[in-house]
Structures are given as C-alpha cells and as structure tokens.
Amino acid sequence: MKFKYGAIVFSGLLGVSAILAACGARGKFNQVDDGKIKLASSLTSRSASTALQKVVEKYNKVKGVNDYPIEITQIAGGYDGGRTDLQTRVNVKDTTNFYNLILNYPDLVSTLGRVGMELPFDKVKTDKLADRFLDFNNRISAISKKGIYGIPVSLSTEVLSINGPVLHYILNSAQGKVSSVTSVQRTADSGSGTTNNNGVTKPLKIDKENESTKKLWEEIENKAKENGKKTSSSRRKRNLSSSKQMSTQTQPTDNSNDANQSDQAIEKTWGKYQEVEGGLKDYTFKASVFENWHDLLDFSNRVAKSFSNINTNTNKKGTDIQGVLGIDSTPNSLFTSVFAAGGGNYDNFFYKVANGRADFSNFKNKGTSYQNLQKVYGDYKGLIDSNGLFVNKGGSYSSNFQKFHQLAYSISSTSGFFYSFAGENSKRLKFDGGNFIEFPGFTQAIYAPENNSQSGGESGDQTTNNEANLLGTFKIKSSNKSKSSSSKSSTKAETGKTSGGDQNQGKKGEGAQNQGKKGEGAQNQGKNGGVETTIYLYKNSIPSGKNKGENAILIDNKTIVEQLESAAKKEDKKSGESTTEQTQIQSKSVTEQKQPKIIGYTTTGNVHEDNKHIFPIDKLTSDRNFDRKIIVGATEETLDKSNTLQSNEAIVLPAPSKYKSTDTNKVTITQGPNIIGIHVNEKENAETQKFVDWFLNSPQTWEGKGKGKEQTNKTAAEFFAESASYILPLKEIFEQKNEKKEGSDQKDSKSNGRGKQTNLYTEKALELFRGISTDQIVSYSDQVTLGVVVSVME
C-alpha cells in the first residue's frame, strides 16, 4: 500500500475554515440593533430542545427590566445545517437577520474569525469550568488574540459498547463450545453441562491467567446468561400456552444452560463459526484488545473472517448482520487513532496553529502525521476488506443494528445512551427489500376510514365528497395541563394498544437517513389521562367543520394518497385482523372484536424523509417546532427480547485510548456543541455576554420531572446539560470522584419506557473527563481540525 498526495479534501470529515482563514480575508460588519438577543439552535434532540426553551423562558422571566429578551432562532439540518446557515450569513454580510449566539461546534469560530465577527467572552466568568476543557480555544485558527470564544456547555465523549451475548457466541463458538440445537436440548433434559468441539481443531484460547481478561470473560458469560434467561422464559411460556400437560412439568431452576440458550439464539442470525487461517483459529483473546486501536481492528478482522454471514455478504440488507465493529463518527475514530499514534501530541498531528494560522507542513512533507495515518489506514483497510466494518451512513447509527444483535460492538457518543438499547417490546418498521427503521417515538398509527362512521363532516354529516376525501385518521392525547393548542402540551405516542414511547427516537436503518448528529434518548410524549383528539387526513380539500393544523391535515402528495388508499383496500388475512404483522414469540390470542385497519404511521420523531416510504406533511399546531412525517408501506414487527440487546446485557468500556498497547499516553476525544458568540454591535454584544454569564453562573429554581420530584436549584447551564444527557465540565464534578451528579446518571422513567436506568455512558464519560482534568488522559478535540488537504489512500 502507498499514499499518493493530491488535492483531495476529506469532504464531510473536514471543513474549509482553516483554509479560508489562511487567505486573511477580513470584513467585519455591524448588525442592526433590534432590541433582542437571538440564539441560533439546530438541536434535533427533543430533550435538548425542550430544555433550551425552558432556559429562554426562565431568563426572560427573571431578567432586568431594561435587559434585552432572548429568543430562539431554529435552524433545520442539525449542526451541519447550522454551520451552513452561519457561513451563508457571513458571506452575504447579513445585517438584519443574523443572530448573536449559536450552539454548534467551535470550528465556526474560525469561520467568524476570518472576517472579524468572533465575539470574545471577556465579560463572562468561566472560572467554574475545568481549564483542560477550555484550552482548545488556543488552537482555533484565524484567531490571533487569545481568549474564550467557545464555551463547552454540553460535553460528551465516545465509548466502546459491547454486545455481551453476541461476543459470547463469537468467543464460545471459536472455542468449539457452542452446542447444536439437539445437544442443547439433551443437556437441558439431563442436567449435564457438557459441550463438544464441533469440529474445531485449534480452538481459541482465553487468557484467564490475566486478571483483567478473566474478569471480562466472566462478565461476558453473565451477559449471555441474562440473554439466555429471556430465551428460556419465552420457550417455557409458549410450551405452557400450547399444552396443559406442560404446566405440570418441572422446569429447570438454575441458569447453567442460559448461556447456551443465548448462543443458540445468536447463531440463527450470525451463522456457524468457520475455522480459517487469519481468523480466530488458535487465537489468544485478551481484554487488552479493546484498549488500543491496532488490536481492536485486528481482532475485529479475525472475527469477520470467521463468519461467512459477514465476509461473503456484499449486498447487505437492513436486517442482515452489518459487521463486527460499528463506528458512528468516521472522522472521530480515524483522527483519534492518528492522534494517539502520534503520542497525543499536536506537534505530531496534521497541523499546528501558530499566530492564528494553521500550519499543515507536517502532513504535506510526509512527516509524522502522514506516516501515522498510513499505519492507521492499513489497520482499517484490513477490516474493510473482510466486510467487518460498519460506518454511520448519514444517520444509520450503529445502535440501530447493535440492539438487534447485528453488530458485536460499536463506538458511539456517550450522549446516546437512551438510543442504544431495546425496550421491553422492541419494535421496528420493515419495508420492502429488508430495510427497516426502529419504531420511532412520538408515533401514531393511521387507521383506514370506517364506512358510514368516519366522514369527517360536521355533526355526523356523511356527504359523499367528504367520505371520498377522507384518507384516514389518527389519535393524539393532549396533556391535562395544556392551556391551548400552542402551549407546552405534547402528544402521546401510540399505535393500537402499544406505545412508541418506550422506543428510541427515530434513528434510521438501512435505506433512509436520520437527520443531524446522534443525540440524546427519546422522551415519551404526553401523559396518561390526557384528552384524546382524532386527527383527520384528507386529500383534495378539508371540509367545513374541520380546521387545518388543529384536527385536520391536507395531504397533497399523490404518492402518499395512492399508498394510503391502496393499503385501505387491501384484503385482510382474516376478517377483523390488522394488516400490521406482529412477529411475536409470546403471541396473544386474536381478539374476536373487529380492529381498525392500520394503513400507515405518522410521527414527529427524528426520522429523515426518503420520499419513498417516509414523507414530510403539514404539522399540527401542537407539534410546535417539530416536523411531522408520514410513513407508508411499512410492516410493524415486534421482536422477542432474546433477539435484542438490553442495557444490562451490554459491557461499556472507554473507546480505545491508544493506537498500540506500547504507547505511553492515553487519548480521549471531547466533543459537543459550544455556545459561540457573534459580533453584532456594542449594545447587543454587552447584552449577549450578560445572558451567557447568567447561563453559566446564576442558580435558578427548576421544576422536577415526574410525580414526586422536588424542585432543584442549579444554573441554566447545568439544567440544560443534564436534561440532554451531556456533561457540563465543572471543576466540582471532577473533584467528586465517586459521587453521582444529580440528573446526569438517572433519566426519568417516562423518557425511555424502561424505568429508571443507570446511565452507563455518562458514568464512563465522567470517569474519562476526570482523567483529562488531572492530566492522566490527553484530550483530543476534532472541532478545530479543519481545512486539511490530505492524500488519497491507495
């Protein structure tokens, strides 16, 4: 393998701010004083958006009489959309509709700096924040005057999340210990725990002499047993329901065979282990493979070679095994690897910042960073060639697949804990061709019109025109506390008898993409006991008596109309059965009462329209800032728990902190949106700094979440970070070695439908950030690695 240097930019991985900064263009301009502070937000997470709105409302309530109020300017398209919007306004010198603040990544400071539009927070007290999380300001290109230009108000890092049951199957099968279906049944009946080698001649060895490896293997076994319990329980319930005689039989009470049951379930999708050269044949497994990139990629490559369902599948469908290792952020993983290979020293990285300018001579002259990239790429290429690497394709996050046992482990943001695991009833929507999306939160089923009962007319009016124009209906529940259609009320996600609230919020599987970065877990909309409202979907026109945006939506997309009408006309398999297919292991008896026919779904969850199955439609007034979509041509599928990953079956480790085990320094990425100031005019600049100082330093009273929750007293910055599963890098947090920060480790049970869970990702993030704050770990920030012209690998 060799490198060929060329003028190819890592499109999508790196920006152009540093290159533009090198041109030295200046063009500072003032904006019109409009008497208010505008905060630009492109947050896609409901929890973060809701928290930010509450912060704005709080400030406007407690601010001084003469202080400028603050309002949110919503920008579509996630952080990339926010970046594009800011660059456009800078380029056209927008003096009337620009904003004062933006929540985004600090590379935007370079964009502002090249035209002198950056705003230093020299009137804001930042002494409560740990210094190590502010020093990236010294490495921002296009900024010559030292100062604080970006304040990290919502930090996250990355973790390695291991699917315990899947990894157990991989290691156990490579040891020759995975029993066949018949032998598993026989050992269960006899009480024997014996296994066979299944033709494995040189089995994998687990280095149990190493204490860390021994401990990890025991943990992996326990996770497999947890998964096996679900399988055993499901089978016993099925047997009991199908035969009264079975109810009197003695069932096994120990869990000695649960791990085998788990392996058997995983084998159905992963296939059988193949003993091949360069695979896991005669391989010695150690816990240290997860501590450095070189060994992790090598081990992953060996696993991929050992399973034909991975290495021979060149046309993966959404329901297939996607690989061994999943990576949500390609630039994060690639550049962190290279940074670690350079000893965690920016002098050995792609660029150096001197006097506000980025110097890329180290890379251009084929120096240390070039050589390190060459080594790192070689490791990645091996895994790519064996088809074992899954990368996020515009929103198809690893957790979408890992929670369905389609990956062995993945590297993802700590802000995504409540996205990463399946609920009690794990549902997804399948499309033709094997593609799917996880069942989004904030979703309602659309029902076909019932003849002679749902015309949409006023007071029972059932005119022919109204009946012909009615496509379907769905129901929403408004909170009892709702004061008006535009108030803080929200809708309860529901489809038939099941709720989408316990599912994660709309992350797209293979085929259609999700918007924005991966963010925080979904929150359940609405409350029990709310007022139920029927919403009518019409084509052509909305009849009198119905109000657009209140209880009616007009569908003018012909494809949607045709799909809804086609679904409504389809013959049911049985009279009274929904066309939705429920693939449930624990089946329920079919009700004799006629059920309404489901012909589609509508959601305000964060799913991306593909204009094939998912389309944008008009939203309701109660949807507030969240866009509504319609989903057609989907089949709902409910999976057995043994086919899904629960949080208690995962092993959460730090993402690899070294390139090779012999490296001296550990490296951890720090990421997350900063609050960034923009020059407007003298008066508004002062008002902007006043708000930011209040945001960071003024404790306020906040209502607790859920029944019985007490009010809390904290700053707006703390409230925002904790509400969104982020971490505010306060010195006091890192000094509390084993204490849990209120709100950051627990999530209200309504936000995920699975009761209270310890946020394993946040706990790991706090551990890593403490290491950074005490200089035990080197922090890497990708947000200022911009405009690098790099080579093509060949």
From Swiss-Prot:
Topological type in the membrane: Lipid-anchor
Biased composition (Polar residues): 182-200, 245-261, 511-526, 577-593
Positions of N-palmitoyl cysteine lipidation: 23
Keywords of the record: Cell membrane, Lipoprotein, Membrane, Palmitate, Signal
Lipidation residue positions, type S-diacylglycerol cysteine: 23
InterPro entries (alphabetical): Lipoprotein_10_C (IPR004890), Mycoplasma_lipoprotein_cen_dom (IPR004984)
Primary location: membrane
UniProt region (Disordered), positions on chain: 182-208, 222-261, 474-529, 566-594, 737-757
GO CC term, one of those recorded: plasma membrane
Record field: compositional bias (Low complexity): 475-501
Segment forming the signal sequence: 1-22
Compartments where located: Cell membrane
Basic and acidic residues bias locations: 567-576, 737-751
One Pfam family named in its UniProt record: Lipoprotein_X
Family, similarity comment: Belongs to the MG185/MG260 family.
Name assigned to this protein: Uncharacterized lipoprotein MPN_152
Species assigned in the record: Mycoplasma pneumoniae (strain ATCC 29342 / M129 / Subtype 1)
Organismal lineage: Bacteria, Bacillati, Mycoplasmatota, Mycoplasmoidales, Mycoplasmoidaceae
